[in-house]
From Swiss-Prot:
Zn(2+) binds at H233, H237. Belongs to the peptidase M43B family. Residues 1-22 form the signal peptide. This is Extracellular metalloprotease AFUA_1G07730.
């Protein structure tokens, strides 16, 4: 675990942020030629519908007020998984910057992340996601309410032909073609599972957590995707959010992400356009600055008010005390 002295931590963050350009080794991203999202199951959609109805009703008193104001602190573990040739890719400074960005991104939701520890492992198979189940069985810490993030230096799907099958298990993933590999993924993460309760065996949630390409951490070599935004996006899924373009349709019967204040959006955003309107007959422009779109890191800026509320409600409903 990194020793975080608060004063040193703040000074180091200021220094590192000012020198971030010097830390970044440029690697061109050629664009996401393949974006695949495993859809949420019926039980998870039903929970979103229930919470939508819950959030739209008038407040019923002190319980609702306490739930709305109670700070949420999530125990968190970072696991750095590297291959032999890139064992030094992820520095302590990159870990600190990623944690800082994580805290800032979620502070308006009164959600904070208490880093319990950082583990480091050199394993060629795990680094490329060759055996996700074995890796998580060996490395995962804590209960269902504990966030585990696996930063892998060469995160890939098992094979191009298996990608559709690989994305059909309810995880949310986004992918790209790059000069680093024929097909790589920026990250994927599990959504909360309504069937998990406080007495569920550890084996029932052994794969819970977020897998993130380590090159997307602040100071990493992935140009346009090296400010740490991928981890923010994936942890949004862990907190229960769907993509802003969920359903990829402008149809009135498409519930989208079940969030009332995210405009209807039919396609993911690539890069950072000045503006975009994929559903011109629906109110509002695409929220290209939303962490739950597929925009580049320089475009990411915020969650909506209702997304912040939904993440809190998902925590109390799906993860707290489990």
């Amino acid at each position: 675990m990194l020793p975080f002295n608060s004063c040193v931590y703040v000074l180091l963050i200021i220094s590192l942020m000012s020198n971030c350009r010097a830390l970044c080794r440029a690697t061109a991203l050629q664009g996401r030629s393949l974006c695949a999202t495993g859809g949420p199951d019926a039980a998870f959609r039903a929970e979103h519908e229930r919470l939508s109805a819950f959030e739209s009703r008038p407040s019923s008193g002190s319980y609702d007020m306490r739930r709305a104001l109670e700070p949420i602190e999530i125990e968190t573990w970072f696991h750095i998984v590297s291959g032999e040739t890139d064992a030094d890719l992820v520095t302590d400074e990159m870990v600190i910057l990623q944690l800082h960005y994580l805290q800032k991104a979620y502070e308006k939701a009164s959600i904070s992340y208490r880093l319990k520890g950082v583990t480091r492992h050199i394993n060629e198979t795990w680094a490329r996601n060759g055996d996700d189940s074995a890796m998580k069985k060996a490395l995962r810490r804590g209960g269902y309410s504990t966030l585990n993030v696996y930063f892998q230096t060469n995160l890939q799907p098992p094979s191009t032909t298996d990608f559709a099958r690989w994305t059909s298990d309810g995880d949310n993933r986004h992918a790209y073609n790059s000069d680093l590999a024929p097909l790589s993924v920026l990250g994927f993460c599990t959504l909360p599972d309504p069937s998990i309760n406080s007495s569920s065996p550890r084996s029932s949630y052994s794969k819970d957590g977020c897998n993130v390409l380590a090159k997307t951490m602040p100071g990493g070599p992935m140009t346009h995707y090296n400010r740490g935004g991928t981890a923010i996006h994936e942890i949004g899924h862990w907190n229960g959010l769907l993509h802003t373009f969920e359903g990829e349709s402008c149809s009135e019967d498409n519930a989208g992400d079940y969030i009332a204040d995210t405009p209807q959006q039919s396609v993911p955003t690539d890069g950072c356009p000045s503006q975009k309107d994929s559903c011109p007959d629906s109110p509002g422009l695409d929220d290209i600055h939303n962490f739950m779109d597929y925009s580049s890191d320089d475009c990411y800026a915020s969650f909506t008010s209702n997304q912040l509320k939904r993440m809190r409600d998902m925590w109390f409903s799906m993860r707290k005390g489990k």
